[in-house]
Amino acid sequence: MTIPEKPQGVIWTDAQWQSIYATGQDVLVAAAAGSGKTAVLVERIIQKILRDGIDVDRLLVVTFTNLSAREMKHRVDQRIQEASIADPANAHLKNQRIKIHQAQISTLHSFCLKLIQQHYDVLNIDPNFRTSSEAENILLLEQTIDEVIEQHYDILDPAFIELTEQLSSDRSDDQFRMIIKQLYFFSVANPNPTNWLDQLVTPYEEEAQQAQLIQLLTDLSKVFITAAYDALNKAYDLFSMMDSVDKHLAVIEDERRLMGRVLEGGFIDIPYLTGHEFGARLPNVTAKIKEANEMMVDALEDAKLQYKKYKSLIDKVKSDYFSREADDLKADMQQLAPRVKYLARIVKDVMSEFNRKKRSKNILDFSDYEHFALQILTNEDGSPSEIAESYRQHFQEILVDEYQDTNRVQEKILSCIKTGDEHNGNLFMVGDVKQSIYKFRQADPSLFIEKYQRFTIDGDGTGRRIDLSQNFRSRKEVLSTTNYIFKHMMDEQVGEVKYDEAAQLYYGAPYDESDHPVNLKVLVEADQEHSDLTGSEQEAHFIVEQVKDILEHQKVYDMKTGSYRSATYKDIVILERSFGQARNLQQAFKNEDIPFHVNSREGYFEQTEVRLVLSFLRAIDNPLQDIYLVGLMRSVIYQFKEDELAQIRILSPNDDYFYQSIVNYINDEAADAILVDKLKMFLSDIQSYQQYSKDHPVYQLIDKFYNDHYVIQYFSGLIGGRGRRANLYGLFNKAIEFENSSFRGLYQFIRFIDELIERGKDFGEENVVGPNDNVVRMMTIHSSKGLEFPFVIYSGLSKDFNKRDLKQPVILNQQFGLGMDYFDVDKEMAFPSLASVAYRAVAEKELVSEEMRLVYVALTRAKEQLYLIGRVKNDKSLLELEQLSISGEHIAVNERLTSPNPFHLIYSILSKHQSASIPDDLKFEKDIAQIEDSSRPNVNISIVYFEDVSTETILDNDEYRSVNQLETMQNGNEDVKAQIKHQLDYRYPYVNDTKKPSKQSVSELKRQYETEESGTSYERVRQYRIGFSTYERPKFLSEQGKRKANEIGTLMHTVMQHLPFKKERISEVELHQYIDGLIDKHIIEADAKKDIRMDEIMTFINSELYSIIAEAEQVYRELPFVVNQALVDQLPQGDEDVSIIQGMIDLIFVKDGVHYFVDYKTDAFNRRRGMTDEEIGTQLKNKYKIQMKYYQNTLQTILNKEVKGYLYFFKFGTLQL
């Protein structure tokens, strides 16, 4: 059937129009992010009903989630109602309003369940079956594995003994059980699980398949060997330009001869590679060599680096791929064959017994849904059954959403009920393989990729492929930068799909033309000497600063009205790969009083209230578990103190269990009577609850504990009470759900919880935040899929990929099967086998490809602006990333395969575009004009150096030191104030021309020049300074008066910031009243008052400087400035080493037309014997002369007026500069 001509003025693009009306063959719509695929899918359904007269219940619409199904059905229903209202006489539309309720718009699991309910007789099962809960399924499978393993322990087959020796430890066989479980889940994701398990042994027995594996490794090795040879040649070329390096060149020439032999004839000679030594040691670079090449120091270092890279690449091939001879690898495969075959037998036994148990309990799980549906739809030979034929006749079209996330079983089910072949079928599939991120759920993106490569745009002889590439979500800056990154990152070799013109994103949203560049911010960690915070904590604080900046400066564009509004909390989302950073972010946002919510399905078991209840349950189940028993005793419920626990243990130091110590203490005549009574009450509770648990279900035991100790009421009254209460009720509800399964009892419930914790399967904190609540959100990339946000902060880019599974002794792969390491039972030594090496390499490639797709999902969530946050320990590593090798339009394959994290690739790609210092042979394009607009990145790269605030560091805290919060005690000249504010907000006019914006605090310049004057080498770096000084103090520190010197300095500055200046001076009583006012306003903490040096402040109030300020014409406090160093130092404009200076001036006052600045100092200093006040004053002036010079010159530069200054030391007095 031909596609109707698109009328003028319709909202659909040409590709969308084709997607709506294409028919007569299978259709695959590759719908890029934000391309409106849901709207297209709904419109296609509607047109099938309106234009083609098809009944809605004769369409099968398969969605990925139940929520998507409900939304889809609602949209279709609304459109039918609108059409029916417009044409009330249309009987067909009236019928559709009735039939919509029976329409098959659902997940595939729901369709399978309906199929089973209608044809249960074919399966010979009880029609009154129920679906097992997750808890029940986990426990039943665990129980089955235990029983099957016990049966095989009774048999003690030699292959089983070898398996247990290889996969179990002396202490447990947990790893063995885990591998069995993984194999079970892998197998049931295939249409024929038994057949898949039977084929696992084939590569171990057949030499033809072993030869294929060796070829696979050889091809992969060629990538690294070629890269190694390139690095070797670069090293040779660099050394060839130098003097006195003949010995180095000789070594490299020998290596080149060896490598030429390996690569001879275009083939990789693996035997020659493994049989010879490569990477001879280069001679040392002596002082004489350095002197002879003093103008080529960088080239010398680069040459050494290239040779080191050559050695590491060769070492990788020899250690990772061919650590042993090919014949030895094949021999190991023969030895492993019986073990692999026996392991498959165990898994088949587990599968059989597990199915038997489920049938006996009359329960089904989701895997049963799929396999029973397939059993109904196929004959024994695999051909479609009569029932399948009837469904083929019934469904006129099958529409599948999120097709990239289907697995092989689901694909087989769909093939049974679709009609025709690809060239004349009725299967409509929509999805985006670049967003296939569910491999851990056995999703198989290769299904999409195979069809994408096979189908054609015109559909001749096969299915039709349609590319939806126009993005209606994001600004063009987000799209072009995303395109640029993936154009150079993703291809068939790494990423599994080519990111070409058909795959890239095209701008389609009606935004205005204002500039909103993507921001790549690289945080360089402060070391332990300069910050008490860990790198992750520093990143969390930095993220908060980005959020504050968005809220203060950014706006959101309303496409409907064409106007802007201010950004709010809910416009911002923080995306990370996992929730590992959640706690740090929660604390950092809490410190700044910014509402923040973690949209988590993790972390539930770590919540204090949940841990308390679980400790209670574990202690009741078995009080001989010391950790949980003592945890319960120390909780808010029983409130035993540490010294009480110590008393108990001291009397019985050799007891195996603390419970025994409690009993012995109660019976000891020397025991403290009060503590004995307390312990008796505690043990009475334990015994009472134990008795209660024998006769009541777990949920009633939990309910009794809640009521007896007012647990709900207590935690509801704490910070975050709503969430805590929800968590407690959530655990109670899970216990009810557990009791509704076929399992019972406290022990089984605890075992179920332990299994969830071990598997990393979490209930998640109960969600008390709605979608419209005005909070900043954090979520994983997985949970953000399908969503969009005005501002996306994609952080955690420097967190390494999780390659833990690659280190396991057994590697699983849907396509290839099972790769098991070889274990020599006699020598008790493990070696990589041919299969484990090959499958590990394949798995690593698939892992990196999926991580790339996660990056794509994250980047394409942003509507207005995208922030990318990376973190490095030092800036030297950035130079290495800038110089990553390339191959054609992509980062070299070897670099991508071994990339440790997303930042590694993203920074390398974007820096190659921006940095002028990168050689042409490492750039993707020599001329920016070569780049098409759709993939020309618009990105600002900032290198940011983290540093904590100290008493000598200029304070940047926005809460107290914002120009917008200026305090003046006098009615100053508003024009002058506006002029000062305008000029102090000066910004470097050529900022758009800079590649890496640079900024230095005045304190840093002070330290820099001090270092230069001392003769020490100091590298001037471009940087931002970030300061945090208002961390929430632990209560025990406040109570013990242990406020640090830098905190006292910050406290004194805060008091001085708000100090009133009166001509009659303020009294000591008024000073106390003023500080009490700061406490009432929550500007300072209540416990901080004792640390304020009242006598020192009173000394200042009684000083001549205070009187001068009080009589001034204007007074301005806490003024930040950002100014070009070139203007201050009178350097030539365009000097590339010039930095932007950033600082904060404590106070400026104007008297008799002259501007004065004041800088407060809380320094402590030693008054050496014999030194006069004049000598001390001179010493202190010298200490801060550079900093003061910059203050004075900066103000004189931007005000164009005479400026004088004062230093005020609380422990010394006034110094006029």
UniProtKB/Swiss-Prot annotation:
Sequence similarity: Belongs to the helicase family. AddA subfamily.
PROSITE patterns in UniProt: UVRD_HELICASE_ATP_BIND (PS51198), UVRD_HELICASE_CTER (PS51217)
A biological process term (GO) from this entry: recombinational repair
Limits of the UvrD-like helicase C-terminal domain: 476-786
Protein name according to UniProt: ATP-dependent helicase/nuclease subunit A
Residue intervals of the UvrD-like helicase ATP-binding domain: 10-475
Keyword Endoplasmic reticulum: no
Source organism: Staphylococcus aureus (strain NCTC 8325 / PS 47)
Function statement: The heterodimer acts as both an ATP-dependent DNA helicase and an ATP-dependent, dual-direction single-stranded exonuclease. Recognizes the chi site generating a DNA molecule suitable for the initiation of homologous recombination. The AddA nuclease domain is required for chi fragment generation; this subunit has the helicase and 3' -> 5' nuclease activities.
Entry keyword ATP-binding: yes
Residues the entry annotates as binding ATP: 31-38
Domain of life: Bacteria
Catalytic activity: Couples ATP hydrolysis with the unwinding of duplex DNA by translocating in the 3'-5' direction; ATP + H2O = ADP + phosphate + H(+)
